[in-house]
Amino acid sequence: MGHRKLASPRRGSAGLRPRKRSSELLPTPRTWPQINSPNPKLLGFVGYKVGMSHVFMIDDWPNSPTNGKEIYMPVTVLEVPPIIPLALRAYAVDGKGEPNVITEYWSPSSLQFLDITRRIRSFSSFLKNDESKKKFEEKFGSKLDLIKSNLDRIVYFRLLVATQPRKIPSLGKKVPDLVEIQIGGGEKKAQLDYALNVLGKEISIKDVFKEGQLIDVVGVTKGKGFAGVIKRYSVVELPRWHKHRKGSRKIGTRGPSLGTPSYTPQPGQLGFHRRTEYNKRIIKIGDDPKEINPAGGFVRYGIVRNTYILLEGSILGSKKRPIFLREAVRPSYVFENAPKITYVNLLSKQG
């Protein structure tokens, strides 16, 4: 029945399988872009989703019918307090031709970030006295020498950074989120010097991204629980007449009796999937929360108290969920400047 492929194509995307729950709440990107920059920089950042609002802005997309005119634009608000790099990981190619971690170097200044003991309990033993801190330096001091001696073998560097949820009272948590962020731009020696310089120091989102550029968003979607085939795959509901008395919100058949094909729609987990959305434009990066906080705060979140960004359109995930922001791997356009915003909605979102 090849003719049925035109009138009734298969339901559900095979590119999104398996439709299972994500193994981690803050996923790390599986690929990183190659940037042409003489100076090293981080290729990503972490923020927390606040909610949505809308602005009026001057359309600056080239060849757009509304270019130069004021347009309405829905935006997503993310709160992005500074992140703190704690460790440096060096990757080199192994015998199988795949890059793997050869060692990692923890800076002594990382012990000043006391919340790390909430995530890594074993580090609490290094905070007892000065003697224990010296043991920490002796343990990881040789790691840095190993990195410098194998600099020609290293493929790339990544920084293990921690977020600061303590600065966001709306989240109601103190345990930091740890994630790896790759360093791009410059030569290997310059990347190593950059990493050693920023270890233990706060990095702002303005050091990574700028207004107007396109970025990718990596995160976990909203969880919907167990769902049937109608909602999960959008298959056509069967007619509700006497010959379909066994049910309508189901598929007609699962196939031959030799085993159900993997492509046959079946009920199961819906939502809480790891997904990547490409080319989300940064409309604005602001330091004054009064410019974005609506009357009464954001529903189910509260008010923004730190640096924030506005992303064009909607993004995945629920409110208060950590979202990974990455340099665009395939930007559709490179903007020179940020768009001009003429109005930001500050009316109450509580109805």
From Swiss-Prot:
GO terms under cellular component: cytosolic large ribosomal subunit
Region span, Disordered: 1-31, 246-271
Gene Ontology biological process terms from the UniProt entry: translation
Keyword RNA-binding: yes
Ribonucleoprotein listed as a keyword: yes
Keywords: Ribonucleoprotein, Ribosomal protein, RNA-binding, rRNA-binding
Highest taxon above the source species: Archaea
Pfam family, any one: Ribosomal_L3
InterPro entries: L3_arc_euk, Ribosomal_L3_dom_3_arc_sf, Ribosomal_uL3, Ribosomal_uL3_arc, Ribosomal_uL3_CS, Transl_B-barrel_sf
GO molecular function: rRNA binding; structural constituent of ribosome
Function comment: One of the primary rRNA binding proteins, it binds directly near the 3'-end of the 23S rRNA, where it nucleates assembly of the 50S subunit.
Record NCBIfam families: L3_arch, PRK04231.1
PANTHER family in the cross-refs: 60S RIBOSOMAL PROTEIN L3-RELATED, LARGE RIBOSOMAL SUBUNIT PROTEIN UL3
Subunit structure: Part of the 50S ribosomal subunit. Forms a cluster with proteins L14 and L24e.
Family the UniProt entry places it in: Belongs to the universal ribosomal protein uL3 family.
Protein's recorded name: Large ribosomal subunit protein uL3
Organism in which the protein naturally occurs: Saccharolobus islandicus (strain M.16.27)
